[in-house]
């Protein structure tokens, strides 16, 4: 009996030491060691041409010194599958891996992470999927996971119960309660081809322009295909106001926004989750007013507007949802004629 226990303990210890030891060996090769497993060659090639090619694999994916038993157990199971020849058609990230990687993004992208973490796109599974007002009016369905929980491996019924208009609702996976339902990899593909990233300074700044116009990493993760689709390959919808075709900004970054902030099949402005601008803001990109990670808008009016409007009023104090969420004049769709009828007054003369 004691001998069996000792053999079992030795086997477990060997396995515990084998995986970190193997990880350390592969890490010493700067990524090339990973290609010893031939199924990793494609991913290595993608990384080697990406903006992150100057960053070692373990920096984002974890390595020998990662203090997460589940990480090493998962690697051990992958090793067993590899030895058995039980190889997946493609290698993807489990939801657990994605959540861990999101925290690692902060080590380099501090400003972006802070803005995302303080904004609505970091909303947790519990905040999104246990919302009483939403769930009472709209029955939860698998399609909810297209934007909220896109890396979750199963369906909505395995995540929330009950699936009905009457609660109380609870998460079947309580470990995901406080985890972000829209992590970094929802909108970014870390192996996307691009120029090598520049290391940030101690204050989080980088030399040169602070923001690329179209970062190569922008991509929407499609849970059906388990692929990240580049923003450059996503369509900008042809939006309508009644029968009229709405003028759209050509900013291709918006195509990513429209994957979730989308109209219904009629493509009418303000239908579904759409916020396409018409009226005084028609033709302006979402990103002209909303910051990419935090959706901060408080300073955005001053970017384009003089303080006073044609009416002689402070644009930030007008009766719109910019000033008050309860206003009947939504800032996305407000028109001069909403307040002035058919006669828009001429600009008031300034008083010296």
Give each language-model segment a name.
Residues 1-352:
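Short sequence/structural segments immediately N-terminal
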């Amino acid at each position: 009996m004691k001998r069996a226990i000792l053999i079992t303990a030795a086997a477990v210890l060997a396995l515990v030491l084998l995986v970190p030891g193997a990880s350390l060996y592969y890490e010493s090769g700067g990524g090339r060691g990973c290609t010893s497993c031939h199924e990793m060659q494609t991913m290595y090639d993608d990384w080697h041409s990406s903006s992150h090619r100057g960053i070692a694999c373990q920096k984002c994916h974890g390595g020998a010194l990662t203090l997460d038993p589940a990480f090493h157990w998962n690697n051990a199971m992958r090793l067993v599958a590899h030895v058995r020849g039980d190889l997946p058609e493609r290698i993807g990230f489990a939801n657990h891996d994605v959540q861990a990687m999101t925290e690692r993004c902060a080590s380099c992208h501090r400003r972006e992470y802070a803005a995302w973490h303080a904004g609505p796109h970091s909303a947790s599974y519990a905040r999104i999927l246990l919302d009483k007002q939403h769930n009472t009016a709209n029955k939860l369905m698998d399609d909810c996971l297209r934007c909220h929980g896109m890396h979750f491996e199963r369906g909505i019924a395995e995540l929330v119960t009950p699936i009905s208009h009457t609660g109380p609702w609870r998460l079947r996976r309580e470990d995901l309660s406080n985890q972000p339902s829209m992590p970094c990899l929802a909108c970014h593909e870390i192996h996307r081809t691009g120029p090598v990233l520049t290391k940030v300074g101690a204050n989080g700044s980088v030399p040169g322009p602070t923001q690329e116009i179209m970062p190569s990493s922008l991509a929407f993760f499609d849970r059906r295909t388990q692929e990240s689709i580049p923003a450059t390959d996503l369509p900008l919808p042809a939006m309508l106001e009644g029968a009229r075709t709405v003028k759209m900004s050509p900013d291709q970054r918006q195509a990513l926004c429209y994957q979730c902030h989308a109209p219904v099949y009629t493509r009418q402005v303000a239908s579904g989750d759409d916020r396409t601008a018409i009226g005084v803001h028609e033709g302006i990109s979402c990103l002209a007013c909303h910051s990419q990670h935090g959706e901060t808008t408080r300073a955005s009016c001053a970017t384009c507007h003089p303080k006073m409007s044609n009416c002689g009023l402070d644009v930030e104090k007008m009766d719109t949802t910019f000033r008050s969420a309860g206003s009947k004049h939504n800032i996305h769709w407000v028109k001069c004629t909403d307040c002035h009828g058919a006669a828009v007054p001429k600009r008031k003369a300034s008083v010296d």
